[in-house]
Design a protein with these regions (language model features):
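A broad, structural surface signal
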Residues: 53-61, 95-102
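A domain-level signal for the structural core that forms small-molecule/cofactor-binding pockets
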Residues: 58, 115-118, 142, 155, ...
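Non-catalytic terminal extensions that flank enzyme cores
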Residues: 1-38, 153-154, 160-164
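Active/ligand-binding-proximal structured segments within catalytic/core domains
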Residues: 27-60, 70-71
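Short coil/turn segments at secondary-structure boundaries
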Residues: 42-50, 68, 81-88, 92
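Conserved alpha/beta core surface patches that mediate binding of polyanionic ligands
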Residues: 12-16, 56-65
């Protein structure tokens, strides 16, 4: 089997920021990395779930709403993926994400936290979501990272896979 592209990122050197994870078939997947993998705690599931609801709501109502395909959490709980059509640079996504995080910090409730609207409506934590949002906002404004550190992987057959 081929190595999945996201597994070629050196997670021991990955910093919070915004990265282009992949570009294919007219879609761009952005990696909104909130915490430093394997060095900081992952975002708590309830806070991440609230962040998902809030970010999805904001992005789908933003100036970029017609280009938003998907907003959702990474399985490792260290960030969010945003999939877009259109031509957005990392700086465009940084600006949009900063605006989104500022909006989240002003919210008093998480949208769609009813049993008919959410599959796990009790798993939410707005205060912790806002704490994570404030920390990520500060990082995007003062310590921004957008270039992946690549990892070389030797496959079972001895070939070297490096996604450059």
């Amino acid at each position: 089997m081929e190595v999945i592209q996201s597994f070629t990122i050196d997670h021991t050197r990955l910093k919070p920021g915004i990265y282009v994870s992949r570009e294919d078939k007219g879609f761009t997947t952005y990696d909104l990395r909130i915490t430093e993998p394997n060095k900081e705690p992952a975002v708590a599931p309830a806070a991440m779930h609230s962040l998902e609801h809030l970010m999805a709501t904001w992005f789908r109502n933003s100036e970029a709403k017609d280009d938003v395909v998907y907003v959702g959490p990474m399985g490792c709980l260290t960030g969010m993926y945003v999939i877009m059509t259109g031509n957005y640079t990392v700086e465009d996504m940084r600006r949009l994400t900063i605006d989104c995080l500022r909006w989240i910090l002003e919210q008093d409730e998480v949208p769609a936290t009813r049993p008919e609207a959410c599959g796990n409506y009790l798993l939410h934590d707005l205060p912790m979501c806002k704490w994570e949002s404030a920390r990520y906002l500060d990082r995007l404004q003062h310590d921004f990272h957008s270039e992946y550190a690549k990892l070389q992987i030797v496959l079972d057959d001895g070939k070297v896979f490096a996604d450059a």
